[in-house]
Amino acid sequence: MEDSRETSPSSNNSSEELSSTLQLSKGMSIFLDILRRADKNDDGKLSFEEFKAYFADGVLSGEELHELFHTIDTHNTNNLDTEELCEYFSQHLGEYENVLAALEDLNLSILKAMGKTKKDYQEASNLEQFVTRFLLKETLNQLQSLQNSLECAMETTEEQTRQERQGPSKPEVLSIQWPGKRSSRRVQRHNSFSPNSPQFNVSSPALLEEDNQWMTQINRLQKLIDRLEKKDLKLEPLEEEIIEENTKPHIMLVQRQMSVTEEDLEEFQLALKHYVESASAQSGCLRISIQKLSNESRYMIYEFWENSSVWNRHLQTNYSKTFQRSNVDFLETPELTSTMLVPASWWILNNN
């Protein structure tokens, strides 16, 4: 299915110029894709803020990211283009040069196979359809197995780096202001052929809590956050809560607001489903609740964690990073996240 969304002439010209002027070696086309995804204002180059939003990994500090940016910026323009990205990373690929080349071939082969499947599947015999479904499933299993191995390698290398760093500086907190809504230009998606699987339903009991008492508490916390932001709250405690020495006095509440583009809503819902399933399985996660605002593609996600340390460890997990990375494409504007500590007694009271 062709993408009917309009793209700006400058974006098309920029892509054509890059393809024609750059003689990319095998496997380096990934950097064209990186530039398209990270370039939020579609000017064909990356500012430092765009670079930071895409490349920050939670290990390098802001100063280190800034130093890396200027190392790559050999043209000294305070912007990065595809040529500079390719020139820098091509010097450090090692064995991954072969990996990227193989991925490029694999991507083309899969797209070709899926295109033929889309064309021939409907008219195929029952046996041929079975074989097609089987091959799709087994191909997916093989790719997922490779993904699991890569995720283990990522976790190991990141943990090793953290342990080796003496007096680690505070990881860079991502914060980038995008002007208005996202540009309509997207990375070209090859997902026109997909199985008719049941659509992810955010109103399912596992994800959208309809318990009135619970939602009342969430609304109460929302009002409290709003009042705190207005700075007109006068704290006059009517009751003093006595906390025992070994009792954990607070838990962490995380509120996340996400405005999703209409065309990416289904993919976002699937990514959100996987994220919630993974996060909910963590021992420090007390509860996750989701609200979708009516008549809007805006989601409010409330996460309750045992403490801030558990929450910070959660942010470094692969499933959390995968969800954040996918949101680069799915969200119209940057995600808004706010955190606050709430009395642990509230949680105990509402779960007894």
Swiss-Prot record:
Residues 26-61, 60-95 form the EF-hand domain. InterPro entries: ABM_dom, Dimeric_a/b-barrel, EF-hand-dom_pair, EF_Hand_1_Ca_BS, EF_hand_dom, NECAB1/2/3. The keyword Lipid biosynthesis does not apply. Keywords: Calcium, Coiled coil, Cytoplasm, Metal-binding, Phosphoprotein, Repeat. Expressed in brain (at protein level). Expressed in the cerebral cortex only in layer 4, thalamic nuclei (the mediodorsal nucleus), hippocampus (a small band of pyramidal neurons at the boundary between CA1 and CA3), interneurons interspersed throughout the hippocampus proper, interneurons in the hilus, bodies of the neurons but also their dendritic projections (at protein level). Pfam families: ABM. It is found in: Cytoplasm. Residues 135-163, 209-275 form a coiled coil. Residues 252-340 form the ABM domain. This is N-terminal EF-hand calcium-binding protein 1. The lineage of its organism: Eukaryota, Metazoa, Chordata, Craniata, Vertebrata. The gene is Necab1.
